From Swiss-Prot:
Residues reported in the UniProt entry to bind heme b: 52
Cofactor needs: heme b
MF annotations from Gene Ontology: ferric iron binding; ferroxidase activity; heme binding
Similarity comment: family membership: Belongs to the bacterioferritin family.
EC number of the protein: 1.16.3.1
UniProt-recorded name of the protein: Bacterioferritin
Organism: Mycolicibacterium paratuberculosis (strain ATCC BAA-968 / K-10)
Catalysis performed (reactions): 4 Fe(2+) + O2 + 4 H(+) = 4 Fe(3+) + 2 H2O; Fe(2+)(in) = Fe(2+)(out)
Cross-referenced InterPro entries: Bacterioferritin (IPR002024), Ferritin-like (IPR012347), Ferritin-like_diiron (IPR009040), Ferritin-like_SF (IPR009078), Ferritin_DPS_dom (IPR008331)
Cross-referenced Pfam families: Ferritin
Cofactor binding description: Binds 1 heme b (iron(II)-protoporphyrin IX) group per dimer.
Protein residues bound to Fe cation 1: 18, 51, 54, 127
Binding, Fe cation 2: 51, 94, 127, 130
Gene coding for it: bfr
Length: 159
């Protein structure tokens, strides 16, 4: 099924965003684990896998529309050197996704591609949850202070 070139461009642009997020979140999770924040690392790793599922769905859609998924391009990774920097960097990606997808959904509807619009809406719903999580972590860090927040994230050895 031949897809609209503009819709395919939007799909590939979002694919680039998802591939970038996969890498950034995965590296952040490995750094968090290395710092001893095991539970936090598990959550961040799960977010990376969520982005992988988005990339898979987008890839499937591009292929169905007779397009070619571009796996050779990434946006710049923003690797935080502290938990705060990581949360802020991950939040920036999520805000960019929202800014990209909201007009993309409208364009897909105008092009009468409700399936791609629905896919983008599902991604927006997932990203809203991730934004809420990241904003909450930053708020907790502000309320508790970095030291107390970090202490709450440290894994305790089994007794």
């Amino acid at each position: 099924m031949q897809g609209d070139p503009e819709v395919l461009r939007l799909l590939n642009e979002q694919l680039t965003s998802e591939l970038t997020a996969i890498n950034q979140y995965f590296l952040h999770s490995k750094m968090q684990d290395n710092w001893g924040f095991t539970e936090l690392a598990e959550h961040t790793r799960a977010e990376s896998f969520d982005e992988m599922r988005h990339a898979e769905a987008i890839t499937d859609r591009i292929l169905l529309l007779d397009g070619l998924p571009n796996y050779q391009r990434l946006f710049s990774l923003r690797i935080g050197q502290t938990l705060r920097e990581q949360f802020e960097a991950d939040l920036a990606i999520e805000y960019e996704v929202m800014d990209r997808l909201k007009p993309a959904i409208i364009l897909c509807r105008e092009k009468q591609d409700s399936t791609t619009a629905t896919l983008f809406e599902q991604i927006v719903a997932d990203e809203e949850k991730h934004i809420d999580y990241l904003e909450t972590q930053l708020e907790l860090m502000d309320k508790l202070g970095v030291e107390l927040y970090s202490a709450q994230c440290v894994s305790r050895p089994p007794s």
